[in-house]
UniProtKB/Swiss-Prot annotation:
This is Outer dynein arm-docking complex subunit 2. One of its GO terms (cellular component) is ciliary base. It comes from Homo sapiens. Disulfide bonds: none annotated. It comes from the Eukaryota. Expressed in respiratory epithelial cells (at protein level). Component of the outer dynein arm-docking complex (ODA-DC) that mediates outer dynein arms (ODA) binding onto the doublet microtubule. Involved in mediating assembly of both ODAs and their axonemal docking complex onto ciliary microtubules.
Amino acid sequence: MGVALRKLTQWTAAGHGTGILEITPLNEAILKEIIVFVESFIYKHPQEAKFVFVEPLEWNTSLAPSAFESGYVVSETTVKSEEVDKNGQPLLFLSVPQIKIRSFGQLSRLLLIAKTGKLKEAQACVEANRDPIVKILGSDYNTMKENSIALNILGKITRDDDPESEIKMKIAMLLKQLDLHLLNHSLKHISLEISLSPMTVKKDIELLKRFSGKGNQTVLESIEYTSDYEFSNGCRAPPWRQIRGEICYVLVKPHDGETLCITCSAGGVFLNGGKTDDEGDVNYERKGSIYKNLVTFLREKSPKFSENMSKLGISFSEDQQKEKDQLGKAPKKEEAAALRKDISGSDKRSLEKNQINFWRNQMTKRWEPSLNWKTTVNYKGKGSAKEIQEDKHTGKLEKPRPSVSHGRAQLLRKSAEKIEETVSDSSSESEEDEEPPDHRQEASADLPSEYWQIQKLVKYLKGGNQTATVIALCSMRDFSLAQETCQLAIRDVGGLEVLINLLETDEVKCKIGSLKILKEISHNPQIRQNIVDLGGLPIMVNILDSPHKSLKCLAAETIANVAKFKRARRVVRQHGGITKLVALLDCAHDSTKPAQSSLYEARDVEVARCGALALWSCSKSHTNKEAIRKAGGIPLLARLLKTSHENMLIPVVGTLQECASEENYRAAIKAERIIENLVKNLNSENEQLQEHCAMAIYQCAEDKETRDLVRLHGGLKPLASLLNNTDNKERLAAVTGAIWKCSISKENVTKFREYKAIETLVGLLTDQPEEVLVNVVGALGECCQERENRVIVRKCGGIQPLVNLLVGINQALLVNVTKAVGACAVEPESMMIIDRLDGVRLLWSLLKNPHPDVKASAAWALCPCIKNAKDAGEMVRSFVGGLELIVNLLKSDNKEVLASVCAAITNIAKDQENLAVITDHGVVPLLSKLANTNNNKLRHHLAEAISRCCMWGRNRVAFGEHKAVAPLVRYLKSNDTNVHRATAQALYQLSEDADNCITMHENGAVKLLLDMVGSPDQDLQEAAAGCISNIRRLALATEKARYT
């Protein structure tokens, strides 16, 4: 079960968060098999069904408490099973919406209760419990991988003293059998998968276009692509959708229906969400079933299309049959034999996993995602695209057209590597992690003479003696090895294998010559990949132990070049390279002293520099960062940071900058007093060093103590002065980022105001890249929390560019700009400008943004806008559908969105007409539904919203009817004074209704309110006293009525 879920299920990308299962046929098939297994478990294995899990399986369920009947204790918001463990804890506990289940028996019953919603529940459970084996049987059973067999599990459990070991053994075996079943089932499913190619889709569309137009004799009214641009692989979908297998999107107008927006993908054809009204972009979400091709889809959707196709006798079968034949061909005998040989010695599960990967390679190797655009519009006079080139300054790579000339051995090797990479740890790496497709020189290409000369030298390397080898290496270095032609000439004739073999000889001169060449050519991304494929990295890691300092330096520099992608970084770590590289940093014992004439000391410094360079490349992996820390890298880096050698400082600070994203490192950086040296190096003349120091400060300044250290060591002034140089955008982004994070502290903001940094930041609001704008706006958002700075921003003309940025699409930028605009809106003069520029409408439109952070930030920004606008009530009503939109946001699952919307509703409800409108839109039941929350921020603003909404019609009574009063009384037990004040005011308003007074009294409100009457907060005093007065008045009236 664990292996199948980890290897076969297809997940969406989720940034730094957890992904969700994609809605694909394979995922649905896996979930259905799991449901069948769990449903039948209670009948087939009644004894094992009672076994209590080590940890409960938890997820958010869509089931309501009312769905549970006999066998459960049901209340309004909770459900407990009558079945309990030996400690009396229920085996099923539901507290809407979270559910916790601790036995297979309760899982089986839940699926029976879910009925038609069982697939949704299974999906939610799998998404929330990525490693169910550990939760069911404990962390000791996390070793149940592909190579686990029955004897392994049996041996493990029989060594355990747990009296339930026999049941655990049976469950472990059952889960293992389920895992094997899922792998076999998926193998069959994958082998039958549809795999359309861009060429097939294009031919179908072109043929349909020929028979489209007005009139009854055509099959369609029209068919057209949504995009005129075509990539070099034949796809028209954007690259981030090509990764999901999507080829293109077409708009089809049949004779007998509305226009359909259709997605054509490698997995088939389906209806998507259509074009959006606002931007005209495609809503990529699938809205129906997947069909094997476009014609089958249209036959199903349009009877007229099917009828006219039959009349015209159009046949798509010939081309499609060819495609099917190519797809359906069994792997060639040589490939099958190689596959068997490759996996010999492994068990049955490994064989099946390799077969799955092999079939996937067979189905997808005809086309791969591409970033190279080509247009179908005829632009005359334009040259053809250049061949792949690497930008030496930025290291960015323009991806070439995929090669189809891969050898069979390479195909099998890559398949095995993909399995290994899936099992290995993943890391959140922002650098170039893509391995470039292989790219061979074409035989017919016009190659320069150097290409052939280098190939001759490689032959001497292969067959010559030691002297000839050294001469050949020296001669090869005379060529311009920075040119791609020379690099690929060495590779194409087998020179890389020879150079790597030379590293295993005992001749130091041969090793040095080989490493010098490898260091130069490993700047090429393809060469880097080839070096890893040929096993060159472990050999270089071993050379780091050499007593020869020149060898150490060259090996470390070459590792630094090669470790630019994830697989290479993993290989370095797995062969002990991180520990050895950290040890190189200890060579520079005297690095803190001025450079001396001693060659020995200069070499020590160079060894440390090369080690730092390699660690910089390796530190882009989360696991490697932790390995560097455990190997004692931080104290050594801190010592090297005091050096006067500028070329040493850049890789040292670069490594610290990468590692500072980890909390453990930030604490260690403070402990080692590194901030002081980072600040000192901000005054360096070297722009790259300044950039990395600023970036390291940006990463560390999340912590208040670090922000104070930057100020105390005089770091704010150089940061402010660096804002004036805007030519170097990378440095400007780092500097503005550091200023943003430092501005979180008010003391730092005061200093920035002294240094005139706020005026400079306002000047950077235009004509800058988004990376800079995000940081500039973030810094202004923090600075504008103070009145003096808001005035500066307004007087410098900063309001208009801020409002202009509200129409962007960058999520981080929108979050920051809404915060900045909201901060400025506190000042009435600034609010007038925002209103005149239509800023409030733009903020309101951001409530439709799909990102919760943007929605929340926009809602917070609306609060001061509504509060300080001249005619706020009329302004809000002028937004068509605006009030309904904000009320509907109360259905969100995000706590920050809910809190911000409640705050906005509090301000909106100050106008009676608006309060009447939102009441009609159902604000009362939605607010009441949120009352059972433990989040103090949400409680505060929710109570304020309820208090304000009570002032219309019979809303007070309605809140009581929707059970909002009792949860509000519990808020008085909170330790937050803001919650107390808002709650007391809400209860005072609600106590105007007699039924609510009774509910408050029954829930112990009087005692809690009496304590608050003595509060130093006057508003809290008055509200608490008023509420007690109303309750007392009702009690007296009741008493009087009883005796009369």
